């Protein structure tokens, strides 16, 4: 069994004997996988941006070892609650607004509850770490993509639907997913592809992606061909024509 511990005010001696005390750290089997930094919403001189800077600048400089196995970080001022990759710009930190896929989206102080119950549920946290954190095979910069909650729920729902309708028992219709512009559809497809390829239920499936736009074709082919390690298959190819 995995051992989960959430520790607050954990003292860490870092570079040049600097003592740093993150507000919260989540450990799984003794490994620090999430670091949390909180600011108070009632103090006008501190904001959630200060929490972001403290994590990604000060702690990154002074206690880099704590982030060696980091999955993601959390910043909060009580009213605004966001998570994201340690390497991401602030604009790419997002709230986790649902506990379950069919729930109503919540914001503000309620989003702290949805994050704790929705993202930090033990089985779900492990699921996010296993399948929903993406590294490209090669990159000239630090890049790590952590799923947003709509991507997590969509990929899981698609996976279960494909499984339920698999032939010969099923009708072979895995379902239709509609994603609005800017929702991160390409990453949803990437997360789903990894789930299918890594699943013990499916036996080395062949996954075919068809696009109807040249720009999307270029984007997806580059992304998938550059994600062989993440997907778990070396035979990822881009086909120019069906001829």
Role assignments for model-derived ranges:
Residues 1-211, 215-231:
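ATP-dependent helicase/translocase motor core
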Residues 225-243:
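Inter-Walker segment of RecA-like/P-loop motor cores
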